[in-house]
Every structure is written in structure tokens, then in C-alpha cells.
């Protein structure tokens, strides 16, 4: 990866950490999930408003490291307006990217900013926490999601 690309990716992560998108509660959410990463201390909640099979709105709140917060912010942008199946597909491609099992070619530049995370296994949990919570919420599961035992 070129130095310019690394700088761009770092800038994207820092910007979404400082000014996260969709950092709010959806009062009339049809689904909600809580996520916890005990290793890093990340704690967040994800709200989803489904309209039939479509993610009409998605938001999050919580605290965590820059990677966790930026990933949650970008996740909300990536899945809003998508069908459940499309959102799950984006989840799968993002997880493949951060675990080094995919190149993220189909993901936008924002999500590809997390491509270097695969080199730091503990940070994979930070990057994927909001995604696991979102997947749990759209599946209608109510139990908290933990990164313990997951990638």
C-alpha cells in the first residue's frame, strides 16, 4: 500500500472517529443490539429501523477506540437503504477485509480504510464490533453481542 493511500485511510478513520455519522438513538427503532469488546473496552449500541426487508435507518451510540467508532460510523452509511441480504453481504465482505481473507474490492474507499486492521488481530474485534451488532439487530436477536470468541 502506498504512503498516500495509508494517509488517506488514516484520515478517513480519524475523521469518522471525531465526527461520527448517525451517532444518535432511533426512537422508533424496530431492532436494537448492544455490543461489547472486553479486550479494548468498546461498548456500543446499534439501532435499526426496518421497512419491510430494507434497512430504512441505522444508528449507533457508545464509546470506544477510534477504529471501533469509525467502523460503526461507516457501517451505518454502508447499510442504510440496503436490503437485509445486501447488508449481510456487505458485513461478510467487510469481515473478510479486516481478517485478511478478502481485498474489499467491492467496498467503497471508506470501508477499505480498514484493510490494514488484519495485521493487528486485537483490532479486528474493534473494527467488527458494530457490524456484529448490526447483523444481530437485523436478524431480530436481542442478546448482547461480544467479540469474545469471534473475529
Predicted regions and their residues:
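Structured beta-strand/loop patches that form or line metal/cofactor-binding pockets in enzymes
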Residues: 19-62
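Alpha-helical support elements that line or immediately flank enzyme active sites
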Residues: 71-83
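C-terminal binding/interaction regions
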Residues: 1-27, 82-151
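Short, thiol/selenol-centered motifs that function as redox-active sites or metal-ligating centers
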Residues: 62-69
Amino acid at each position: 500500500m502506498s504512503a498516500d493511500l495509508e494517509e488517506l485511510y488514516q484520515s478517513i478513520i480519524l475523521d469518522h472517529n471525531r465526527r461520527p455519522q448517525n451517532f444518535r438513538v432511533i426512537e422508533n427503532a424496530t431492532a436494537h443490539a448492544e455490543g461489547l469488546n472486553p479486550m479494548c473496552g468498546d461498548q456500543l449500541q446499534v439501532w435499526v429501523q426496518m421497512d419491510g426487508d430494507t434497512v430504512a435507518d441505522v444508528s449507533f451510540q457508545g464509546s470506544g477506540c477510534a477504529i471501533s467508532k469509525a467502523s460503526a460510523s461507516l457501517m451505518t452509511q454502508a447499510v442504510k437503504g440496503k436490503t437485509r441480504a445486501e447488508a449481510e453481504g456487505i458485513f461478510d465482505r467487510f469481515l473478510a477485509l479486516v481478517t485478511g481473507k478478502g481485498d474489499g474490492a467491492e467496498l467503497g474507499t471508506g470501508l477499505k480504510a480498514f484493510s490494514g486492521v488484519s495485521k493487528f488481530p486485537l483490532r479486528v474485534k474493534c473494527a467488527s464490533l458494530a457490524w456484529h451488532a448490526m447483523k444481530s439487530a437485523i436478524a431480530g436477536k436481542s442478546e448482547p453481542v461480544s467479540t469474545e470468541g469471534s473475529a
